[in-house]
Regions:
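Non-catalytic, low-structured ubiquitin/UBL-interacting segments
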Residues: 1-51
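Short alpha-helical basic/polar micro-motif
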Residues: 62
Length: 263
């Protein structure tokens, strides 16, 4: 019954308003800007190839930063072990991201990508099956925090926004690293992408908010970036979608990745 209702909603002509939750982070002197090489030969790559990973659903929460970072960590671990990928609890990541950004989890208002990367560097990540957190207001137990400390990233870098397309291709193709990205959402365009699986400009609609996603590949055949979303498997191509160069360059807020020796 719920599935049928959702399918009917996605067939409506009026654009849907989506749950988002990413704030634009202003570049400052705290940042380590990723250095990139020019002239990367574009070729298709899919960091989720052979990995049994399903898109998640953030429901009506603003926890997209936690979901996107969880996907990034799964991809990193899959580089070490594709046959048995780990799923990471997004509520744990979202908890620490908000604590670092706002000092509280009283409000489910989203977070910043900087604090999301910082959260996993400082407090690690929890394997889903070992975690009791099941809502955006849950607090981790001391034993869970101790367990998460074993899975920390060593460093992270901001991608240069002024040459974001080249930076994304370099990071994905040359370094084979996933990217945590935030984009402005234009409801009509993202509603169309939910049906076609491709995000591209289709007008001058105002931006309605920011949304965090994970970039995991590049398709040379149509010059698009592959991305995971957190709006469930009924959206896009079973929860995944492609981003056109025009949309990425126009609506990118900020983007980050881990250092090459990430664990």
């Amino acid at each position: 019954m719920i599935i049928d209702l959702l399918r009917r909603l996605f067939k409506k002509k009026q654009p849907l308003k989506f749950s988002c939750g990413a704030f634009k982070d202003i570049e400052d002197d705290r940042d380590y800007i990723k250095e990139i090489e020019q002239g990367i030969d574009p070729k298709s790559i899919n960091l989720l190839d052979g990995v049994n990973f399903k898109a998640t659903w953030q429901s009506s929460t603003n926890a997209c930063t936690g979901h996107a970072m969880s996907a990034l960590l799964t991809i990193l671990y899959a580089k070490l072990n594709k046959t048995d990928p780990l799923l990471f609890n997004y509520y744990y990541i979202y908890y620490w991201s908000r604590m670092l950004a706002f000092g509280s989890i009283k409000e489910d208002k989203g977070s910043y990508l900087r604090q999301t990367m910082m959260a996993v560097q400082k407090y690690g990540a929890l394997i889903q099956e070992m975690c009791t957190l099941r809502s955006v207001y849950s607090q981790p137990k001391q034993e869970e925090i101790a367990s998460a400390n074993l899975l920390k990233i060593k460093s992270y870098f901001r991608l240069p926004t002024n040459k974001i397309y080249d930076a994304v291709l370099y990071t994905l193709i040359r370094e084979k690293l996933p990217i945590l990205a935030a984009m402005y959402v234009r409801n009509k365009e993202w509603n169309i992408a939910g049906k076609t699986g491709i995000l591209k400009p289709c007008g001058s609609e105002d931006r309605s908010g920011g949304h965090a996603i994970c970039l995991y590949g590049y398709d040379q055949s149509d010059d698009t970036i592959l991305a995971t979303n957190s709006w469930g498997e009924l959206w896009g191509n079973k929860g995944f979608f492609k981003i056109s160069r025009a949309s990425l360059e126009r609506d990118i807020m900020d983007a980050w990745t881990v250092g090459y020796n990430y664990y």
